[in-house]
From Swiss-Prot:
One of its GO terms (biological process) is cytoplasmic translation. Belongs to the universal ribosomal protein uL2 family. The lineage of its organism: Bacteria, Pseudomonadati, Pseudomonadota, Gammaproteobacteria, Vibrionales. SMART domains: Ribosomal_L2 (SM01383), Ribosomal_L2_C (SM01382). It comes from Vibrio campbellii (strain ATCC BAA-1116). Pfam families: Ribosomal_L2, Ribosomal_L2_C. This is Large ribosomal subunit protein uL2.
Length: 274
């Protein structure tokens, strides 16, 4: 994988930094694992904006990724690595010995031709998926299940991982990249190793248009809006906003805690690092 800095042949190219992976598949994705992915521009069924900064962007299909990894005891060979426009991580197309193909998150160090496996008897090797009760303490994992059988929900983006730091009865304690330590059920599954494409964080889009290609619209500051649009809006000339920073709906921002799910507080051993 190479980091390529573009020559400044135009203002839009001057700051572009690309991450080039020669191992990625150059052709089309595997058609049976594609689904329609319609755009909604951040609008709900009433046509009102519910998520800002969404709109436009290149058309693409959704790749059906197997986050559950429940095909136990059947080895699978990695056929190829592919780019996925729906996530920062790359994905791998694997062929099981019974002939079925699936997409999985491409772990770091796993390449075409490697053999992976799922189940309680799977060896501790990058790309293999096991219940966390069978994974040694200290191991690095990704695609961690919060609820057994639901599929992995934690540590799925490029370069992400969690570490198993303790095991206590029905629970294991994991440390996340944010510094948070939390308990999860030991029956839940996780995949050994960390997610690949960790160089994703080094890329520079270089221009606003590159964000628009990805369906991301501009973020406008509240102080330049009108009073009808934002609590910081209005005033004659440039103003400081006149109050502590808030969201467009009046909720304090910049450090204000918004976590509401008290039901799961008991599973958080230590809050994330600030």
């Amino acid at each position: 994988m190479a980091i390529v800095k573009c020559k400044p042949t135009s203002p839009g190219r001057r700051h572009v930094v690309k991450v080039v992976n020669a191992d990625l598949h150059k052709g089309k994705p595997y058609a049976p694992l594609l689904e329609k992915n319609s755009k909604n521009g951040g609008r709900n069924n009433n046509g009102r904006i519910t998520v800002r900064h969404i709109g436009g962007g290149h058309k693409h299909h959704y790749r059906v990724v197997d986050f559950k990894r429940t095909k136990d005891g059947i080895p699978a060979t990695v056929e190829r690595l592919e780019y996925d426009p729906n996530r920062s991580a790359n994905i791998a197309l694997v062929l099981y010995k019974d002939g079925e193909r699936r997409y999985i998150l491409a772990p770091k160090g796993v390449n075409a031709g490697d053999v992976i496996q799922s189940g309680v008897d799977a060896p501790i090797k990058a790309g293999n998926t096991l219940p966390m009760r069978n994974i040694p303490v200290g191991s690095t994992v990704h695609n961690v299940e919060l609820k057994p059988g639901k599929g992995g929900q934690l540590a799925r983006s490029a370069g992400a991982y969690a570490q198993i730091v303790a095991r206590d009865g029905a629970y294991v304690t994991i440390r996340l990249r944010s510094g948070e330590m939390r308990k999860v059920l030991s029956e839940g599954r996780a995949t050994i190793g960390e997610v690949g494409n960790s160089e994703h964080m080094l890329r520079e889009l270089g221009k606003a248009g590159a964000s628009r290609w990805r369906g991301v619209r501009p973020t406008v500051r509240g102080v330049v809006m009108n009073p009808v649009d934002h609590p910081h809006g209005g005033g004659e000339g440039r103003t400081s906003g006149g109050r502590h920073p808030v969201s467009p709906w009046g909720m304090p921002t910049k450090g204000f805690k918004t976590r509401k799910n008290k039901r799961t507080d008991k599973y958080i051993v230590r809050r994330r690092n600030k």
